[in-house]
């Protein structure tokens, strides 16, 4: 470990000072240190494409109809190395798409199909994703053919949608525009368990206590355990899990039944063999396996002998066509528990008619019992789900429509507003879960609006805080939130504690009048007021600047807003305004780091924003924590100057709070939180703080602050990209 080349005879001929797969990392030595890696993902060093490559422009050149035609052909082009069940890959492709999109959760907007992350660990090796590597490999010739014009993320979702079309479903539509990532995400918390299918994510016995933000019951599953809670069949208990997990994916009861039934109308489960004979998952597989996992090198392991979930059988009589057979079998037969050949619990019908049995995947002369999982039986046993299932059974057209819409929602939920959808099949209808915003006016007198704002009695802190609060809800994970729409003036945002409702009401009354007078949207005026505040603050510090501004934001209405769906965007903490709603188990600086990542900011952008906001008087409820200046309202680098000044000493006072005292005299000069002090204690953040504290970087500080501020204000302006 001394950085020298090891002996070529008895040692490893690698310079061990440069870590590859071995060695002790910094996080192993200092596990409690603030890990900034989640802010430094997906940069040009990992991306093989040219710096000016723009997928969203490239995909517009795609021959959409030719691609869809090729996907239709793929569905029935069975390959000997991985033969299609009944000669149709539809079920496999749908499962791939479902499991990509189904990892999304509303709490933080992470997961989902928007990045093509199923290609990488851990998802490519999850127990719930067994053999989906084969689906992606089957798609490779099409990806190879269309190249840069189609991302893996788009192709994975489109394949499932085309699969449904090829089996007779009229789909609701499709939007292209998902951009690929090139390495595993570092910011997604999948759970703390150290083993697959671990379930240490509940607080006691209540199934409602599933740890936030998780939306799956066990490590490595997408939703629920198909055999039952912790592998023990009990449809009513499983119904609780289904309701919680689908709810955390923003699905209501009707959408949940539709998705469960529609997903199981086609395809089958695979468990006709010994699961112990499967090889390692893709990440652990041997190099000669070329990224494929779960290979059975002992027995046949394909076709009718495939093992995936361990459950064995199809749900319906005709698993390659869209019909109402799922409800027919589920509701008309009694079911009993059986074990699959692989030893998994499954439900099979009692006294089923021979003609209602699906045929064997290879020999149509052989028929097998259909099966139901414990989650399927929940659709029959839970009274609410049962009522919905019976309606779907009686009205197949209604079921098909509800499912098509729910499938579209499932596969597009993390794409953000409809303006981001690309292609000829984008539905014209605006859906409330897309958080629609009307187009805003761009042709008003911006200078006149700024003059009216400057002449108002609003303070710099009031203007900047309101703009920040409006914009900070943006999540790069699912492209929700942000300032466009000015939903800060609507329920529930106007009443959030973090938005200081009393102060907000006062500011909005003034800004709404200015919007009316000038023809601007309230959304634009809110951001413009923040910019005016910053320009005033910079002038007070001796710098004349113009903060960039792009008009065109619209104002959403209550009718365009699903108020309940915005609850998950409520800030319960904001390190930028030095505020915690309450004390949490997670350290304040880690909470800020998570929020920073969701906003799409880097570590140095986080640093300069905190330092600037502290001196502008933007702390929540006007607290003085971290306000290391006697020139509040002037955009100075005082925060960094005083943070790095060794004439000061930092003394804990109470939980997460500190006093800054003169090292010699001992008098209290300022107070601070952990969020303030981390910029001097963390070695990386301190290196940034020192840059901004330098005498020659006062101008750079303002320049970088304005750039980071503008990035936040425009984060949801997809029309500017």
From Swiss-Prot:
Record's function text: Bifunctional enzyme with both catalase and broad-spectrum peroxidase activity.
GO biological process: cellular response to hydrogen peroxide; hydrogen peroxide catabolic process
Modified how: Formation of the three residue Trp-Tyr-Met cross-link is important for the catalase, but not the peroxidase activity of the enzyme.
Covalent crosslink: Tryptophyl-tyrosyl-methioninium (Trp-Tyr) (with M-249): 98-223
Record location of the Tryptophyl-tyrosyl-methioninium (Tyr-Met) (with W-98) cross-link: 223-249
EC number of the protein: 1.11.1.21
GO molecular function: catalase activity; heme binding; metal ion binding
PROSITE patterns: PEROXIDASE_2, PEROXIDASE_4
Key word Methyltransferase present: no
EC class (word): oxidoreductase
Quaternary data: Homodimer or homotetramer.
Species of provenance: Legionella pneumophila
InterPro entries per record: Catalase_peroxidase (IPR000763), Haem_peroxidase (IPR002016), Haem_peroxidase_sf (IPR010255), Peroxidases_AS (IPR019794)
Site (Transition state stabilizer): 95
Protein name: Catalase-peroxidase 1
Cellular component GO terms held in the UniProt record: cytosol
Gene name of the record: katG1
Induction (UniProt): Induced during exponential growth.
Record text on cofactor binding: Binds 1 heme b (iron(II)-protoporphyrin IX) group per dimer.
